[in-house]
Amino acid sequence: MDREHLRRIAHEDLGLPTTPYCFASSYEELEDGAKKVEYPCVVKPVMSSSGHGQSIVRSSENLLEAWNEAQHGRRAAAGHENECSRVIVEALAPLDYELTVLTISSCAGITTCEPIAQRQQDGDYRESWQPANIPESIRTNAKDIAKRAVEGLTDIAQEAGETGWGVYGVELFVLKDGSLLFNELSPRPHDTGMVTMISQHYSEFALHALAILGVPITSNYTELSLKNNEVAASHAIVIKAEGSVGFTNIAQALQSGENNRCNLRIFAKPSVHGHRRMAVSLATGLTQEEARENATRIAMSLKTTQTNA
């Protein structure tokens, strides 16, 4: 994602609430920006995803390390070691939790899915569950911010002769006082949205394809498929290795889902170098805690085999 372009559109053009932020093209500019937004702050490359290159900076003593991490973790860093990537430095929000609102732009206009709650680790998704157990006021505000963001981007796309149709993953911060901030936006299906493969009649991938093909996506398409007030959860299966990875004990893992609906999606990724998300487990439960426990149990029951590179 292009964080600079998106942040300027969201805050400066659309007036959406965000954390204080600055952009920097050099370490010296980063120093100035960090002083403006104040410590603690977060430093990210303007082009990256899944937490790559992101650092929380508590004091000026750690700022150079954060600059170097952003340069190393930026998109397309390999082969461009002598080039500097612009970074965003923003104030560290007094965060309570994060939400993703999958928002669909189609020929029928803008519609949203139920907000998705999540757990992050090192700036990357590890678990998500839907529907999020949140107050109605936060739910309404979250959907409103998401719609405003996607309406603005769709207008820009259409001014350029494109449709702008598809799924957008709008990321929001919920602060301890109950207020919401726009964080980021992915103009595509979102990793936390993989839970929709078990929670909705139409997954985020199906909605993306249908919208692009010109099908009018209304609220009927975004309804949950859960029954009896169930909750659905996903658990990212992240493997640390060097080489090719395979999975065994799959049947036993799926049987560990405590008689609830469950599923497992193994990605067709050829190898791992360091750590990589290689699969996702999906499960339902009568409560948020039960759904998360079931998805985690499936993930932990898997066994891996590795062939060194």
Predicted regions and their residues:
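Active-site nucleotide/adenylate-binding loops and adjacent lid/helix of ATP-dependent enzymes
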Residues: M1-T154
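Protein kinase-like catalytic core scaffold
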Residues: T111, Y168, L180-E184
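Peripheral (often C-terminal) accessory segments that flank ATP-dependent C-N-forming ligase machineries
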Residues: L210-A309
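A short, glycine/Asx- and small/polar-enriched loop/turn
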Residues: V37-E38, L175-L181, H275-R277
